Amino acid sequence: MSSRSSRTIYVGNLPGDIREREVEDLFSKYGPVVQIDLKIPPRPPGYAFVEFEDARDADDAIYGRDGYDFDGHHLRVELAHGGRRSSHDARGSYSGRGRGGRGGGDGGGRERGPSRRSEYRVVVSGLPSSASWQDLKDHMRKGGEVCFSQVFRDGRGTTGIVDYTSYEDMKYALDDTEFRNAFSHEYVRVREYDSRRDSRSPSRGRSYSKSRSRGRSPSRSRSRSRSRSKSRSPKAKSLRRSPAKSTSRSPRSRSRSKSRSLSPRGWVTVERHWIALI
C-alpha cells in the first residue's frame, strides 16, 4: 500500500467560509476520500489536507484541481508534507508526454489514467483530438463509477477506453452521447469492448503489412524477367512487326545473337552471307 504522504494533498487559497462538505464535493470525484482536515484561520485564505485511499487518485486531484477557480479563488493543490508535485508533474505521470502524445503526436500517442482495470470495459470512438484521459473520465462518470480511462490516437482518429467498477454502470453507459471539454464538443459512440476486435496491437499490424510487401516482390520480379525474355526474343519482335520490316530486321537480329557464341571470324562469315543474300 502507498504511504500516507503520497496519498494526501494540500489544498490552499480556499475561501474563508468554505465548509468541509464542499471540499469533499470538490475532490470525491477523483476517488474515495479517507479524511479531510480543513483549516480556517482568523484571516483567510483557508487551506485543507485531503487524504485519498489511493495515491493515483491524489495525482488525479492535483491534475484536475490545481489552479481551479472556486468561487473566485484559484486553488493551489499539491502533495502534502513537503512532497510538492505540481499539476504539470501529475500530467507527466499519466500521459508521459503531455497532450501531444508520443513524439509530439505521431499518430500513436497515448494518454493514460489510473492503472486499475476491470472487465467492464467500453470503447469510446469519435473523440475530438483535444480530449485527454481526464476529460474522458469526467464525461463517462455520468454513466457510473469509472476506475480507468485511456485515450489513444491513430490514423483513424481519437479513441478512448473506459473501465467501470460494475456491469450495471457499463451497460448504462452504452449509448451515443455528446462529449464536451474546454476546447470542443463531439457526438461520440460508446460500445462494449470486444477482445477479439480491439486487442490488436500496433506492432502486429505493422508485421502484417511487411509480410504482404514480401509476398508481392516475387511476382514483380517474375513479371520483369518475362518482359526481358520477350524483348530479347527475335520471334517476339517479328510477331509485332509487318512482314516487310521483319525480313529486313530479323536476319540482323539473328546474326547478332549468333555472334555472341561465335568467334569474330565466324561472325564476319555470317555477315557476308547475309549481305550476299541482300
Curated annotation (Swiss-Prot):
Q: Which InterPro entries match?
A: Nucleotide-bd_a/b_plait_sf, RBD_domain_sf, RRM_dom, RRT5_SRSF_SR
Sorted keywords for this record are: mRNA processing, mRNA splicing, Nucleus, Phosphoprotein, Repeat, RNA-binding, Spliceosome
Comment field (misc): The splicing pattern of the pre-mRNA is regulated in a tissue-specific manner and by development, and changes in response to various types of abiotic stresses.
Enumerate composition-biased segments (Basic residues). 207-243
Which first-to-last residue range defines the signal peptide? none
Superkingdom of the source species:
Eukaryota
Oligomeric form and interacting partners = Component of the spliceosome.
Tell me a Gene Ontology molecular-function term this record carries. Answer: RNA binding
What is the protein's major site of localization? nucleus
Q: Where in the cell is it found?
A: Nucleus speckle; Nucleus, Nucleoplasm
**Where does the record place Basic and acidic residues bias?**
81-91, 108-120, 192-201
Q: Where is the composition biased (Gly residues)?
A: 95-107
Residues modified as Phosphoserine: S201, S203, S225, S231, S233, S242, S250, S259, S263
Keyword Iron annotated: no
Q: Residues in domain RRM?
A: 7-82, 120-195
What task does this protein carry out? Probably involved in intron recognition and spliceosome assembly.
Q: A single Pfam family, by name? A: RRM_1
Tell me the protein family, please: Belongs to the splicing factor SR family. SR subfamily.
What protein does this entry describe? Serine/arginine-rich splicing factor SR34B
Q: Which GO terms describe its cellular component?
A: nuclear speck; spliceosomal complex
Q: Which organism is it from?
A: Arabidopsis thaliana
- A single GO BP: RNA splicing
The segments labelled Disordered in the record are 81-121, 192-263
